[in-house]
Each structure stands twice: as structure tokens, then as C-alpha cells.
Amino acid sequence: MDPDHQLASLARDIEVERVRGGVKAAEDRRAICRTRSRIDRGRDPRELVIAQGSPAIVGHSHNIDSTRLDFDLTSEQQSIRKLAKDFADKEIAPGARERDRNETFPKEVLRKMAPLGLLGGPVPEKYGGIGIDYVSHALVTEEVGRADSSVRTTLSVQISLVEMTILKFGTEEQKQRWLPRLCKGEVIGCFGLTEPEVGSDATKIRTSAKRDGDSWVLRGRKTWISNGSVSGLALVFAQADPSKEDKGITAFVLERDRQPYGSQALHGKLGLRSSDSSELILEDVRVPDANRLGEVGQGFKIAMSALDSGRYSVAAGAVGVAQACIDASVTYATTRKTFGKPIAGHQLVTELIADMVVETEAARLLVWRAGDLKDKGRPNTRETSIAKLYASEAAQRAADNAIQIHGGYGFSDEFPVERYWRDARVNRLYEGTTQIQKLIIGRFATGIDAIG
């Protein structure tokens, strides 16, 4: 059978499996737990294949060690995607508009996500997670982002910034102490790095940490902290030795019921209105040294590692927004009629949709490439920044095109595309702005650090 017929046959098989409904939720959960980092090598007509024998792609210090790239999903990964999609369609998307209008934090959605393991996906089972691989994590994040970026933001902070950072840098006692509660949704976590006067240049944070016996006393303010006012646990960065600059920054985990920190919710945001954004207020908060994450002076390294993880999640969520724009635009363009035919029959409208599809597919593959490297334990900062940059920009363009296709209706929240546009905008800001991503990518290309 020639390749085209093989692909067509596989496409039919996948569609039949989709219509059958896949596996039940309990079977999905068992499938998730089995996934780990396995990557089968089947064929999927939607994904990129570089034929065997074609030249390898070469980048600065990132030679690809294979002449064949294959981004197929395993059956387990397909089950994970279906589980996340079904949950997003049933439990997240229906209430997104009202949550956005009322700035309502999605605590009920999170409560329903926890039993499915979606609050601790890539965390190993022994710490309360379900141990899925990074590509699977991207699939879940994309589907959640497709339904509601506010929920996706909450999830990204909980998993990528807080859980995965504790997993990577915490002691065994710290992992056992905090991760199960986070994965079960018993406590919401936040990540306290940004300050009123300090954003991209995190080496200049002013929050102080002064040693006092077996404790530290933290003083300062953080701002634009997602999950801040709803959090029961905060991963906070403070300067323990200003003379050492970034080498003095140290990380601490604060439990609000034991190390009471203050918070003040921020309102009037352009987008992500149902996610929580807050100031954190640290007024001589006493923190045991046992709550220090990593070594003294290791905080900046920990923060950069966490942001790298967060960028991956933001990129996957941005793909979800772009896909939502495509879905809404196709539905509208094939039903709305002008001049006696659906507007999809007008070439300039079709061009807008085609542009959206191309950029979304490209962004998705960039995310999967970064995830594949993460699963293999290989360096991926460059690839993650590329994915974050491209996906966030593509999502904004897709949302803009979607509004154009919807015309006047796109300017009203009776249709979701205006929310997609507002929510997409922040992807170009947090976890490193578009400009910061370009500086990182440029450093890998030239070997020269233009940041400072």
C-alpha cells in the first residue's frame, strides 16, 4: 500500500476510534499512569514527517541525531488528550463567559479536575501525581487553554511553576510534605518573583530575607502573582545577600496558615479575568530554614528553571487559544451567509482561516518538539523559548483574524473570540516577554548575551 493510502486508512481508523468514544474515565486514568515518556513510532497524517534520507536539521549546538522526525502520539497520549478534551468541553467551556464577566475564580472546575489527576499530571505517582510525560502534559494544557485561558493559567502556575519546581529542587521531605496536597487540589500554589519595580530583570528583586537563627525573616512586596489571593502556599524569592546580586537570591516555600503572608487581589485586567492576580505582602514573615528550597543563593537558578517550565505550559496553552479561534471561525464562516453563499466561500475569508491553521499547526509542533526534548532529558531552553515566542504570537494573530471573520459579532462577548483576543495578549508578556524570548534565542544563535 502506498504512503497516501496508508495515511488515509489510518485517518479513518482514528476517526472511528474517536466516534466510539475511546475509553472510560477510569481506564483513561490508568492509561495516563502507564504513559511516562514512551514515544511510539506510528503514523499520524496530521503531524510532520521528514522522510528518511533527507538532510538533518542543524541548529547552533543543537544537531538533531536522526534524519527522521516523527511526532506521532501513542495510544495512551491519545487517551489523555481525549480525557482532557471531554472534560474541557463539558466542565470548563460552558461557564467561561460568565466567569469572565464576573471575574469568578474557577474553584469548582479545579475541584472536579483533581480526581482525574489533572492537577498533578507530570508529577510522579509517589508524590500524588500521575506521572505523564511532557508531551502529554502539553496535550492537557492545550485542551484546557482551548476552553478557557483563565483556567489554564491557574493550572500552569500550580503545576509548571510550583509543583515541578518543588519536584526538581526540593528535598525528599519537602516533596512528601507539599506535592501530594498540591496534586490533590487541597492547596493552591503561587509563584512570587515579580515585584512592583522589578519584572524582566529578576536579578534586582528587593524583597529581603534576613537570617535569624533557624529561621529567615522575609520583607517585601510581589505583584502580578497568579493565584496569589487564593493560594495556601507560595514559592517566594528573596534577596539574602545584596552584595552577591543574583548569587544572593534564595527561594522559600511559605504556607499561609503557618507563615501568614498577605495578599490583595488586582482587578481591571484586560484578559484572564477569572484567574486570580494579586499582590503578595510580606511584612516580617518568619520562615523556618526547613522551608528554604535549594541552597542559599540558588534562588535565581531555581527561578529561571521554573520560568523555562512555565514557558512550555504557556506555549501549549497558546496553541489551545489558536485552535479555539479556528474552531469558532470555521463554525461561523460555514454558517454565516453573504451574497448568497457562506462567507467561507469568499477567498479572503478562507485566506484568514488558512493562515490560522498553518500557524497553529506549526506552533503545536514546536511545542511537541520542546516536550520531546524534555522527556529525553536533553537541553531544551532554546526550543522552549522558540515555542513560547511563536505560539503566543500566533495565538494573537489567530484571535485577531477570528474577530475579523466574525465582523461586528466578534466585538461582542456574545461570541467567544473577543475573549480569546483579550486572553491571548498576556501570553506575550508573562513567563518572559516576546522580547526576552528573542534575546534568549539570539544568544543561542550568536553565542553573545545581549541581555546584560
Residue ranges and their predicted role:
Residues 1, 14-19, 23, 32, ...:
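Hydrophobic alpha-helical signal/anchor motif
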Residues 2-5, 13, 28, 40, ...:
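Intrinsic-disorder-associated, low-complexity terminal segments enriched in Asp/Asn/His/Tyr and depleted
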Residues 34, 51-157, 169-174, 181-186, ...:
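Alpha-helical interface subdomain recognition
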Residues 155, 182, 197-200, 224-227, ...:
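Short Gly/Pro-enriched turn/cap motifs at secondary-structure boundaries
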Residues 185-193:
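A short, Trp-centered hydrophobic/proline-enriched beta-strand micro-motif
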Residues 215, 219-263:
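A short core secondary-structure module
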Residues 284-302:
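Long, acidic (Asp/Glu-rich), low-complexity accessory segments flanking structured domains
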